[in-house]
């Protein structure tokens, strides 16, 4: 009973094999697979020399093979080897033992077939291999090409590190609750900003890839994208984004100065002060409206100068400058309209206005949808400013359009004058041609009775001149009639005394002229009186 309960003890050959395997495996990693396999074969051959410990040697050989398969993945890539080996948690009857010879595979397959297996000398001699057995080829082992870059855990880590390094970062300046700058040009990942400030990925997408003005209200933040400012407002923090990596511009510097002044100002004890987020919001809107006014003044002055010059002289260069300035004014008007619409959309959303009280939310105070008087008055004041800027820009655009139409009309009138002059010359040329026609008749070498008279030359010349003048007079008269511009084809006909005039219903004059309406009223009254007289008679 005691012999059956004793655990098997490792033999010297097993210990020698493990020592040899550890030395050779760590000495050369490139040939580690062949070395380990050869050591495994030697271990099996030595373990078969003693018949008394055959069962123990078989169990230990199985353990050696398991240890070999455990060491190999640590030296090489893990996935291709483990892909070819079965799971260690499977029962022994379903395991495919790793071996480099066909005889060994046959030995283990024979062992699977019979549960009461008793090894014989023939099965032990199979480990030595046959004489005609082919040598081990490189194709029998896993190929190095199978160990791709994606199968290595180190390469996966490198890929993740590269993705993390290539993740876009946002530069920002942070201001604390006291108006002090605590971070200048700090870099944050988008994931960090999303996790830290409770935002959504689409919110940051509107910051870094959208140029349209937006005012987004979130449960714990206010996100603004207005012209040159991209700001995140918390109940005690303000972040000014600079995603393009450019240097600090003058409008942003002026905004930071104004923001610090508004956040650091102290109100009197009796006066109620605005919350932190509203003071920051007011600084943003002030900077945006100031920038709009500065841009409008920069555009308005050259436009007015060009318009005044075009009144005196219409030049090609001035018209070209007017075209360029009109495009700039149209772009500015569109930009101002977008800012006004963004503020107007926020004013129409009562729930967003109520959610803008971030400081009260930190104290678990929530307002109703209609209780937002302070922020509504603040936004309405700046909405009026932006609307005035939009109206002024619209007036400037309409002035440019009117000037263009007037210039076009003047150019058309000049073109018509040139065409009229051309027609006059054509009429004069026609008259001279008719006079020379008569002179050409007498240029033929034919005999006539006028040649022998003394008055022939004077008569023919006089007739030619008179005929030319008649043709010119007729042509100029027709041209003068064509030159007149009339609103109607036919003038008002003359009305004889005692004859009533009934305007044509098809003409606009009969409906719009006050005199005609009064005449119609009198005629109707006369008809009514005459009908009454007939009744009395």
Swiss-Prot record:
GO terms for molecular function: magnesium ion transmembrane transporter activity. It holds the Pfam family MRS2-like. Residues 79-112 are annotated as: Disordered. One of its GO terms (biological process) is mitochondrial magnesium ion transmembrane transport. Homopentamer. Forms homooligomers. Interacts with MFM1. Residues 1-26 form a transit peptide. GO terms for cellular component: mitochondrial inner membrane. The chain crosses the membrane at residues 425-445, 456-476. This is Mitochondrial inner membrane magnesium transporter MRS2. Keywords: Ion transport, Magnesium, Membrane, Mitochondrion, Mitochondrion inner membrane, Transit peptide, Transmembrane, Transmembrane helix, Transport. High-conductance magnesium-selective channel that mediates the influx of magnesium into the mitochondrial matrix. Essential for the splicing of mRNA group II introns in mitochondria by affecting mitochondrial magnesium concentrations, which are critical for group II intron splicing. It also suppresses a variety of mitochondrial intron mutations and its absence may disturb the assembly of mitochondrial membrane complexes. It comes from Gibberella zeae (strain ATCC MYA-4620 / CBS 123657 / FGSC 9075 / NRRL 31084 / PH-1) (Wheat head blight fungus). Belongs to the CorA metal ion transporter (MIT) (TC 1.A.35) family. A motif (YGMN) lies at residues 442-445.
């Amino acid at each position: 009973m005691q012999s059956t309960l004793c655990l098997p003890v490792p033999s010297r050959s097993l210990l020698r094999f493990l020592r040899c395997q550890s030395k050779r495996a760590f000495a050369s990693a490139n040939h580690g697979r062949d070395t380990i396999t050869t050591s495994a074969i030697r271990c099996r051959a030595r373990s078969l020399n003693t018949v008394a410990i055959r069962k123990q040697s078989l169990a230990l050989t199985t353990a050696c093979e398991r240890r070999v398969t455990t060491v190999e993945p640590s030296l090489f890539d893990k996935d291709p080897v483990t892909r070819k080996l079965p799971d260690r948690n499977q029962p022994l009857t379903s395991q495919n033992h790793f071996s480099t010879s066909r005889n060994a595979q046959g030995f283990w397959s024979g062992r699977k077939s019979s549960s009461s297996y008793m090894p014989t000398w023939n099965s032990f001699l199979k480990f030595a291999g046959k004489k005609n057995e082919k040598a081990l080829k490189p194709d029998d082992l896993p190929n190095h090409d199978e160990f791709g870059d994606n199968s290595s855990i180190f390469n996966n880590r490198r890929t993740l590190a590269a993705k993390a390094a290539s993740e876009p970062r946002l530069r920002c300046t942070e201001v604390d609750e006291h108006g002090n700058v605590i971070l200048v040009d700090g870099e944050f990942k988008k994931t960090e900003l999303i996790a830290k400030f409770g935002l959504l990925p689409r919110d940051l997408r509107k910051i870094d890839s959208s140029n349209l003005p937006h005012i987004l209200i979130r449960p714990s933040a206010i996100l603004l994208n207005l012209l040159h400012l991209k700001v995140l407002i918390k109940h005690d923090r303000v972040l000014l984004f600079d995603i393009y990596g450019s240097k600090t511009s003058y409008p942003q510097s002026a905004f930071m100065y104004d923001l610090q002044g508004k956040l650091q100002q102290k109100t009197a004890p009796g006066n109620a002060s605005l919350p932190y987020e509203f003071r920051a919001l007011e600084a943003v809107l002030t900077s945006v409206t100031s920038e709009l006014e500065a841009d409008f003044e920069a555009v308005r002055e050259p436009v007015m100068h060009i318009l005044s010059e075009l009144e005196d002289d219409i030049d090609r260069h001035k018209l070209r400058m007017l075209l360029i300035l009109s495009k700039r004014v149209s772009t500015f008007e569109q930009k101002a309209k977008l800012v006004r619409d963004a503020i107007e959309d926020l004013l129409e959303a009562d729930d967003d206005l109520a959610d803008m009280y971030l400081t009260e939310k930190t104290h678990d105070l929530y307002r109703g949808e209609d209780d937002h008087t302070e922020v509504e008055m603040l936004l309405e004041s700046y909405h009026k400013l932006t609307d005035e800027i939009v109206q002024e820009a619209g007036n400037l655009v309409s002035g440019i359009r009117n000037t263009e139409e007037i210039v076009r009309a003047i150019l058309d009138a000049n073109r018509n004058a040139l065409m009229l002059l051309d027609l006059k010359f054509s009429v004069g040329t026609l008259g001279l041609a008719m006079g020379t026609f008569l002179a050409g008749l007498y240029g033929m070498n034919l005999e006539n009775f006028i040649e022998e008279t003394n008055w022939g030359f004077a008569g023919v010349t006089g007739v030619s001149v008179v005929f030319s003048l008649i043709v010119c007079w007729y042509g100029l008269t027709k041209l003068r009639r064509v030159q007149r511009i009339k609103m109607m084809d036919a003038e008002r006909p003359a009305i004889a005394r005692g004859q009533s005039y009934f305007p044509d219903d098809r003409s606009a004059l009969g409906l719009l002229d006050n005199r005609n309406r009064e005449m119609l009223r009198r005629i109707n009254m006369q008809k009514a009186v005459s009908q009454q007289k007939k009744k009395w008679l």
